[in-house]
Amino acid sequence: QRQMCIRDSARTAREFLAVSDAPSLLRELEPAQITSLEVSLAAAKGDELAKSVYDFTGEMLGAACADFATFCSPEAFVFFGGLTKAGDLIMKPIEDSYNRHVMNIFRGKPKFLVSTLDGSSAAVLGASAVGWEL
């Protein structure tokens, strides 16, 4: 299941639409026309199926962060890329899931941040900063 979180939200939305008959603004579009932006706009308008895409992805990412915290105890998790443009639609489910899955001693400790760097630079600069400290 965790492999789905690496897919884009448009693909996840198409999969949810295929296995559900729940009403959704996304049904007005052909499957090939559904983009991550369309999912985000539908979720912002209160579309429950679109919001469930972010809830699902946030659940998977939060659980993965909880697993990571068990052996690394990070001060923060920094997210970047297009998905983070959804703001609280994705960040709140990530943090909520983390707090449900993590061991008590790590609950509520790390910060969940969105990088202010553009996606192509964020990973390289982050790795460079770690190397600089060594």
Residue ranges and their predicted role:
Residues 3, 7-134:
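ATP-binding/phosphotransfer module of carbohydrate and carboxylate kinases, centering on a glycine-rich
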